[in-house]
Amino acid sequence: MKAEALAQYNTALKAGQKYYKTAVSRGKYPYPLVLDEILPESSIAGYDNLGILEIPTDSVIGTRFAGRKDALAGNFMPLLGPESEFAQKWMRLCEAHLSDEGIRDPIQCFEYLGRFYIQEGNKRCSVLKSYLAPTIPASVTRVIPRWSGDPEIQLYYEFMHFYSLSRLYGVEFRHPGGYARLQAALGFAPEHIWSTEERQSFSAVFSVFQKALEKLPEEHLSHTAAEFLLVWLQLFPFHEIQEVPTNELTARLEKLLPDVIALENERAIELRTEPAGKGPGVLTKILNAVIPEHLDIAFLYSCPPEESTWVRAHDDGRKVLEDRLGSRVTVKTWVRGGKDYGEILEAAIADGGDVVFATDAGMISACRKAATLHPNVRFLNCAVFQPYTGVRMYNGRTYECKFITGAVAGAMTRSDTIGYVANNPIFGTTASVNAFALGARMTNPNARIVLDWACLPGDPVQRLLEQGVTVISNREIVSPSMVQTHFEMGTFRVLLDGSLLPLASPFWDWGELYDKIVRSIFSGDWKTVSGSQAINYWWGMASGVLDVKLSDLLPDGVQSLGQILKEGICDGSIQPFRTRIFDQHGELRNDGSHTLSPEEILSMDWFCDNVDGCIPDFSLLRPEHGETVRVLGLYRDSLLPEAGGDQL
């Protein structure tokens, strides 16, 4: 056993010497960090005795005091020769580790910002590190830093809250919000305290996950295992980690890398606000991109078209696509029925689908999962502001239409009060409310917008009528074919006899959108993007995807104003948010010298000062709206997990 201990020491010594030389050559500190030298006492808010824990070996990076710092390299491998007193003690500990006795006494250490600094037990730690022990028993005292605006300190406070629930080390995020999202992704309520069984189950599976991740190329390992796990849990159940062979698990993790990068990148989403130009672009020609001659296109529906005006509108768009592109495309529709979206997607792909249009936001998870398994298929989902690289999103700038209808409503109201029915509190909805309010104020400086929500129980139009509101903006009409028949949508006036007088109706033309997207694929535009950015098509009225039908019954002046606004928005000379804007709390949101960026517009979570209403709490929504808001909602990251979602 002595010979084995000596051999182990010599191996560890070489590792220590190599680390030391490499660190010195790169101008880095070659010894373990010393906590007392990097942390002034004035930065400490207090201490917390955590008791005896199993701590991650890789997280032990230093010592509490300087001591004899030349005995160990920064990787805790020895630097002194085998004849030294230090080496003799090290080897005796090694013999104990190899015997039935083992190293039983815990080290004593201080934890600061998730890293451990040893006060007693340097050699024990060194021996266990040399054997690649994943954890070390330790008596831990936490050093609590003073709260500050430093992002690292704020993130650590998030970790401390997570630790108070889970009592877990080794789960690391580098950006705010990760711990709360993990708690929710595992199916736990925000303040759920983990049981011993849950902690043990998670640790066992997470260890398998980490080992699979370590097999990725080194350049991919700048992201933490917890960051990869968050993306995994968006697509696959936690237990599946144990059920998949390690090589397959590693392959899946490599395919998730673009989404992991995208989630931490502030500019992860590329909002394409205009359709691609006609014909192959310069970059396509330079790269000699392969341009398809024929495409098999699958449309995925949540129900048959005759059961939903939304699905029927997309089916109308599908027909336009077929009529315009003829033999260049083969188009099939796939209806969910009672099946899982994943099943339908796999069937569509097995049938030869090159392009998949998923027409409902609830299909996002199934599309993302399919995209990791079928990287050569082009997936598009009818949603917006989603940071997923494998699936492109498509939607429209409805706020442009609402600005016009707001101006019409302001001109046509007989009072200063106008009703507005919003659908769901999702990205883009607030911008539409605000654009409508700004349009109304343009023609009626005293206009006030009474906001109600279709996602709440009851009839929002009836509630507005009961308040004496007679001019109301309802939701957009979803297809050109419905403009003449769905007067209850769009903006209308309620007459004395209860009948509706249509004023101006925003409407979608999905056929125009599908035609332009498919033509962009034929032109080679699909490939000319960075793999770490999520592409979201967010087109406006100039693209033809959205328009406003002005009623023939409008006065000539209002009709002319509506036309001028339409033309101005389409040519860019009119920008609804290029004006002085105050919110409901009196905060100046824009001084009028510039317009807001697309990202600022999409992510608005405030209302203009002439809007009376607020974003409804998730708990108040009708159940059928819950799934959409979980996926697209402004506050989706803060929502409680669904009941019964525990994955451990």
Q: Where are the regions a protein language model picked out?
A:
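Flexible loop/hinge segments that line or gate small-molecule binding clefts
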Residues: 372-395
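Periplasmic-binding protein-like
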Residues: 353-361, 380-382, 469-478, 500-508
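A short, basic-hydrophobic beta/loop patch
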Residues: 102-117, 123-155
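Short, charged/polar connector segments at secondary-structure boundaries
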Residues: 1-113, 119-120, 130, 175-188, ...
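An alpha-beta-alpha
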Residues: 404-444, 532-554
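Extracytoplasmic "Venus flytrap"
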Residues: 296-316, 321, 332-336, 426-430
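Hydrophobic alpha-helical segments within soluble ligand-binding/sensing domains
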Residues: 394-416, 507-526
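Segments of small-molecule ligand-sensing domains
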Residues: 524-647
